[in-house]
Amino acid sequence: MVGKTILIVDDEAPIREMIAVALEMAGYECLEAENTQQAHAVIVDRKPDLILLDWMLPGTSGIELARRLKRDELTVDIPIIMLTAKGEEDNKIQGLEVGADDYITKPFSPRELVARLKAVLRRTGPGDSEAPIEVGGLLLDPISHRVTIDGKPAEMGPTEYRLLQFFMTHQERAYTRGQLLDQVWGGNVYVEERTVDVHIRRLRKALGEVYENLVQTVRGTGYRFSTKS
């Protein structure tokens, strides 16, 4: 669970801050938005692992954003927990009917929130982390540690393999070099951030002309793995 990214959408800064402190202490990375417009931009750019979404927001409501996200094939799988002062059963049912995965009524304790969040992530997480991952003709098999491209073995080093595995399991999301170092090399290893660039070049070379463009440079941020040009 640790290392997951949570988007907190609430128009009240003190509530966002309280939630962020509790989640960061539990090992999560937090993103924040104060309205649905900001939230949608963050979701498209970072694709968080879970969204904590306040019901009452200025402009477009949280429930409307949840409805929109669950209609979009790129965001339908992101779990949503609704946050609200509304405790009536009808409101809970409405939230769950649009696709929210859970519902928590204010005020709540940080411990309760973290426990509910962990439960939702367990329920909605990938069922089999050892299943092969396929993007077009690019296939990564976590059990044999083999990569094939259009049925032919791809030669790459162990670091490039780990980098590709991380990218393929975290698609359509931009990562900084520092985040990639933490996720692929490990937080206790001291490596220059530019080392990431070297291994990205090697990975692209191993993927060849057809698939090298899946590993995209995000100017001012770092890299992402995306099937969209």
Swiss-Prot record:
PROSITE patterns: OMPR_PHOB, RESPONSE_REGULATORY. It is found in: Cytoplasm. One of its GO terms (molecular function) is phosphorelay response regulator activity. Keywords: Activator, Cytoplasm, DNA-binding, Phosphate transport, Phosphoprotein, Transcription, Transcription regulation, Transport, Two-component regulatory system. NCBIfam families: PhoB. This protein is a positive regulator for the phosphate regulon. Transcription of this operon is positively regulated by PhoB and PhoR when phosphate is limited. This is Phosphate regulon transcriptional regulatory protein PhoB.
